[in-house]
Amino acid sequence: MAAKIRRDDEVIVLAGKDKGKRGKVLSVVTESGRLFVEGINLIKKHQKPVPQLNQPGGIVEKEASIDVSNVAIYNSETSKADRVGFKIEDGKKLRIFKSTGKTI
């Protein structure tokens, strides 16, 4: 199946503790259907120091993955969550917003 949400897309969270927040997609894990969103689903990780890499130890906040079904692509034109459709133009498959029909 084609990827409806890709890296660098702006998404809005539909469910969970960060519902309603927006962020940029950092990476997508296609095998598990999960993605990492900037500033969303933050966890605290207790990290040991790594002297070889010059990394200090301590409690570090980082993004955890979120299921792709819990986010929707954000349409800045309508300021709402939107669905993604596909259109073939000149032999290329383009992603479009379902509500407006404009390319992403």
UniProtKB/Swiss-Prot annotation:
Gene Ontology terms for molecular function: rRNA binding; structural constituent of ribosome
This chain's function reads:
One of two assembly initiator proteins, it binds directly to the 5'-end of the 23S rRNA, where it nucleates assembly of the 50S subunit. One of the proteins that surrounds the polypeptide exit tunnel on the outside of the subunit.
Show which residues constitute the signal peptide. Answer: none
Please, which domain of life does this record's source organism belong to? Answer: Bacteria
List, alphabetically, the InterPro entries matched.
KOW (IPR005824), Rib_uL2_dom2 (IPR014722), Ribosomal_uL24 (IPR003256), Ribosomal_uL24_CS (IPR005825), Ribosomal_uL24_KOW (IPR041988), Translation_prot_SH3-like_sf (IPR008991)
Subunit structure, as described in the record: Part of the 50S ribosomal subunit.
Q: Please name every pair of cysteines joined by a disulfide bond in this record.
A: none
Biological processes per GO annotation: translation
Key words of the record: Ribonucleoprotein, Ribosomal protein, RNA-binding, rRNA-binding
State the family it belongs to: Belongs to the universal ribosomal protein uL24 family.
Question: Which residue stretches, if any, does this entry annotate as coiled coil?
Answer: none
Keyword Membrane in the entry? The reply is no
| Natural source organism | Pseudoalteromonas translucida (strain TAC 125)
Q: What is this protein called?
A: Large ribosomal subunit protein uL24
Q: Which GO terms describe its cellular component?
A: ribonucleoprotein complex; ribosome
